[in-house]
C-alpha cells in the first residue's frame, strides 16, 4: 500500500526509517515536516501494524510498507521468523533506497532493513537516538552511520566521535512556550501514565490520597488514568476529599503541563524531552519492562541534572508517593530551572540541516 504526495520535481529525496511506537514515529514526523517545508520530497518506510501506519498517511507523506518484526522481548520462533525474512526485506528496501539522497533513522526494528540497504548502496545514513541507552538497531549500525544525533550527552559515547551531536529530540513548540509557574498555596500535581495509563501510578496515587487528606497537605490532583482503570479511580477519588479531577486521557498535554507544579510520570524519551522543554520538575517512575531498561537510563540522566527524582516501579507505593512529593516541594523552582537547562530547542531544524549537509546529489 502506497500513499502519494505532490511535491516539487526539483526536491531532494529523503527516506525516513523507524517505527513501531509513537516514540519512533512522532520525532521522525517533526523532521519530515521541516524537510517538506524546505521543498524536499520525503517518504516513509514502515509496517502495516506499527504506529507509523496510523500516523504517517494523514500527514500526506508517501508511505511504503515492509514485513519485519522485532527481536527484543519476543519468542525464539518470532526471532527466527524475523531473521529469515530479513534478507528479502532488505533487498526490497534497496529499491526504495536507490533514489534517496539520504536516509534518516529513528531506530527500532523497522529501521533495520532500509538502513542496511542504504549502507550497502553507500547512501548516507543519519540516525537519531532518542534514549539515553541506544536501542538494538542503533547499537548495531552505530559505527557505520554518516552522522548521529542524540538526546542525552552520555549517549554520544556509543557513536563515532566527530560525527555525533547532542541535538535533543523534536518536541512540540507549545512545550517550549510554557512560562515558569509561580507556586501557589496549593501544590498542583499532574499524574500521567501515557495514553494507556500506568497500573503502578494509578495504584500508588490512589493509596496516597488518605495520606494527603489526613496530613492536611494542600494539593490539587489531575490524574490521567487511561481508559481501563478510569471508572474505578474516578469513583475512589470522589470519596477522597481532595481537590482535582480524574480523566481517562488528556487531549491538550501542553496545557496540562503548564498548570502543574510537579509531574509524576513514566520516563520515555518523548516524555523526558517534553518535561525539559516545559521546565517542569518531575518524579519519574520508569516502566520496568522497556527494552534494555532504557527508561531507567533516561530517568537517571534527568535526575543527575537535578531536574527529577527517580523512583523504581517496584518501590512506588502510596507511602512512597506521599514521601517523595512532600520531600521535593521545597526544590521545585531549582528542579524546574535544571529541567529547562537540559532542553535542546530546534532539534527538528538541526536534523534537517544535517540531512541536507550529508545528502548525495
Curated annotation (Swiss-Prot):
Enzyme Commission code(s) on record: 2.4.1.227
Name this polypeptide is given: UDP-N-acetylglucosamine--N-acetylmuramyl-(pentapeptide) pyrophosphoryl-undecaprenol N-acetylglucosamine transferase
GO CC aspect terms: plasma membrane
Purpose: Cell wall formation. Catalyzes the transfer of a GlcNAc subunit on undecaprenyl-pyrophosphoryl-MurNAc-pentapeptide (lipid intermediate I) to form undecaprenyl-pyrophosphoryl-MurNAc-(pentapeptide)GlcNAc (lipid intermediate II).
HAMAP family listed in its UniProt record: MurG
Family statement drawn from the similarity comment of this UniProt entry: Belongs to the glycosyltransferase 28 family. MurG subfamily.
Keywords annotated in UniProt: Cell cycle, Cell division, Cell inner membrane, Cell membrane, Cell shape, Cell wall biogenesis/degradation, Glycosyltransferase, Membrane, Peptidoglycan synthesis, Transferase
Enzyme class, first EC level, given as a word: transferase
Gene3D superfamilies: Glycogen Phosphorylase B (3.40.50.2000)
Subcellular location: Cell inner membrane
Gene Ontology biological process terms in this record: carbohydrate metabolic process; cell division; cell wall organization; lipid glycosylation; peptidoglycan biosynthetic process; regulation of cell shape
